[in-house]
Design a protein with these regions (language model features):
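Glycine-rich phosphate/pyrophosphate-binding loop regions near the starts of catalytic domains
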Residues: 23-155
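N-terminal amphipathic/basic leader segments beginning at the initiator methionine
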Residues: 1-34
Length: 155
């Protein structure tokens, strides 16, 4: 039976990345967030919306395109996350929606915990500025599909 390790996925590096990002994520919260890091889904107490006349939920997904290549070439990963949040939040506010929460998806060729933590720190910083909770995410290691230093982010 093949294992993650046999396929080139480093679970230990992923676990280290989670430990490194916990402090950043804690800063990107709202009182309505239920639960913590590591669950299969982020939970948000929607009863906070009951005071609204006609509460509607809006959602948006976006990425940062080729800016990931600029971040990679510069070796600077903490600003790309903030840019990601700006793209998602902008798409929501133009509809008149309040961005309540978001999740992230980070795909990498090889997990470098410090790089992942820097990306998430930027996402958390952007979320804090927008009063938006970061309630979940996924870091996916794709050896063979992406080069070791390649990555993409979406939220």
């Amino acid at each position: 039976m093949a294992t993650y390790k046999d396929s080139g996925v480093d679970i230990d590096a992923g676990d280290r990345a989670v430990e490194l990002m916990k402090a950043s994520i804690a800063k990107a919260s709202r009182p309505e967030v239920m639960g913590g890091i590591g669950g299969f889904a982020g939970l948000f107490d929607a009863s906070a919306l009951k005071s609204m006349k006609q509460p509607l939920l809006a959602t948006s997904t976006d990425g940062v395109g080729t800016k990931t290549e600029i971040a990679r070439q510069m070796g600077k990963y903490d600003t790309i996350g903030e840019d990601l949040v700006a793209m998602v939040v902008d798409d929501l506010v133009v509809c008149g929606a309040e961005p309540l929460f978001m999740t992230d998806y980070i795909a990498v060729g090889k997990v470098v915990p410090e790089h992942i933590a820097d990306i998430v720190a930027g996402i958390a910083r952007g979320c804090s500025k927008a009063n938006t909770a970061l309630i979940g995410g996924e870091t996916a290691e794709h050896p063979g599909l992406l080069d070791d230093d390649e990555f993409d982010v979406a939220g």
